[in-house]
Amino acid sequence: SEPHRQYFVDYSRTHGIALASHDDTTVAHVQQAHAEGASMSEFPTTVLAAREAHQHGMRNVMGGPNVVRGGSHSGNVAAVELARLGLLDILSSDYVPGSLLSAVMCLVEQGVMTWPQAVATVTSTPALATGLTDRGAIEAGLRADLIQVHIAELPNGHRHAVVRAVWREGRRVL
């Protein structure tokens, strides 16, 4: 896989594409990724790797399902643990596309992050990290991709986020 890895490292440099490492476990993994130009560590498997990534100015990406499930399905570090340590920057949907809103809600409900902090993990921070400067915030001149959310109170006392409306580039699509 080394020739393929080098191809993607070179391609991302040539074309100005943000590069992420994957499943960093050790300091050496993070240092190699940083040397290759990675600006993100996707799914660091240990607190050690996540800390090292931050020391190199890299953003840590974790999966929404990890937050919702309460931990990694493969026994790696929990996203909530990284959030508590100030090491969680971006949430990705990973293998459950609908997990982002639930993950944001979990982080807030557990008192790990404020609403603005949790929402930034799925909006402005990933947009900036990937060079998508036309989105990620509610500001004049940006795309205006928005969702309207209702927080439903369930009979068991839990709360659940329900999407009520969606706007894409300022036009309501749902």
Language model regions located:
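Short, small/polar residue-rich loop motifs at catalytic or cofactor-binding pockets
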Residues: R159-A161
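His/Asp/Glu-enriched, well-ordered alpha-helical/loop segment
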Residues: H56-N66, G70-I151
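Active-site-proximal flexible loops/turns
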Residues: H29, L101, A152, G157
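Glycine-centered positions in the ABC transporter ATPase nucleotide-binding domain
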Residues: V166-G170
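Conserved acidic residues
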Residues: S39-M40, D89, D145, R164
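Histidine/acidic residue-rich metal-binding segments in metalloenzymes
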Residues: S1-N60, S72-L87
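Short glycine-/small-residue-rich flexible loop motifs, especially phosphate/cofactor-binding loops
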Residues: V9, V30, A50, V104-M105, ...
